[in-house]
Regions:
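A beta-strand edge to alpha-helix "cap/lid" segment located at domain peripheries
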Residues: 2-14, 18, 25-137
């Protein structure tokens, strides 16, 4: 998984896509679905040249479970620190996501075969959550 963060930091869409299985699925936070290395690369290349240029991908609270000797499921929190945010240690709250990554063994390396990204919005922090949990007084 560290290779993903390194490819992101380098802004290298080809290297990023190469860490995915040939027909991997990549579901972005906004619902965009990319299937296969070509779509993953072409979907990230303009981002790395544009708005995401110089950004850093961070992950934490990673949990990995081996489903079999050749399949693993990782869940983690993650987010992007944009280039204009400097040396910030954590992403801003609006850029934090919960991710699920399915990896498959390919010889001596692991490849991402499925990735799903959801913006993290704790229910209790939403307007509805606050209204439903406030105490009457």
């Amino acid at each position: 998984m560290s290779g993903i963060e390194k490819a992101w930091a380098a802004g290298d869409a080809g290297a990023f896509a190469a860490l995915h299985a040939p027909m991997a699925t990549y579901l972005a936070f906004d619902g965009t679905l990319m299937v296969g290395r070509r779509e993953i690369e072409s979907g990230h290349a303009p981002l790395f040249r544009g708005i995401m240029r110089g950004s850093r991908l961070l992950s934490w609270d990673r949990r990995v479970r081996l489903v079999s000797s050749d399949v693993a499921v990782a869940t983690q929190m993650g987010g992007i620190v944009m280039r204009w945010q400097g040396d910030r240690a954590t992403p801003s709250a609006k850029r934090v996501s919960a991710n699920t990554t399915v990896l498959v063994r390919d010889g001596d390396r692991w490849l991402v075969t499925a990735f799903q990204n959801t913006r993290y919005r704790p229910w209790a922090d939403t307007l509805l959550g606050r209204l439903m949990t406030r105490s009457s007084g």
